[in-house]
Swiss-Prot record:
Any one cellular-component term (Gene Ontology): ribonucleoprotein complex
Matching HAMAP family: Ribosomal_uL29
Molecular function GO terms recorded: structural constituent of ribosome
Matching Gene3D superfamilies: 1.10.287.310
Protein name per its UniProtKB record: Large ribosomal subunit protein uL29
Stored Pfam families: Ribosomal_L29 (PF00831)
Key words, A-Z: Ribonucleoprotein, Ribosomal protein
Family recorded in the similarity comment: Belongs to the universal ribosomal protein uL29 family.
InterPro entries to which the protein is assigned, alphabetical: Ribosomal_uL29, Ribosomal_uL29_CS, Ribosomal_uL29_sf
Length: 66
């Protein structure tokens, strides 16, 4: 997910996307703990980075509102 795409979203949409990604991350981690190998090991890393991007831009938007 690109930062420009995130900046176009509202804070509510960002919150919703964060919840979705955290659920997806939990599912991927559960697969790993069961001993299965992931098709793409970069998935977890990419999800974590997307969450970080979303949180960063959310904070930027909240600062602008003040």
């Amino acid at each position: 997910m690109k930062p420009s795409e995130i900046r176009e979203m509202s804070i509510e949409e960002i919150d919703k996307k964060i919840r979705e990604l955290r659920l997806e991350l939990a599912k991927e981690r559960a697969v790993l703990t069961m001993g299965a190998s992931l098709e793409n090991p970069m998935v977890i890393r990419n999800i974590r980075r997307d969450i970080a991007r979303l949180l960063t831009i959310k904070k930027e938007k909240l600062r602008e509102k003040r």
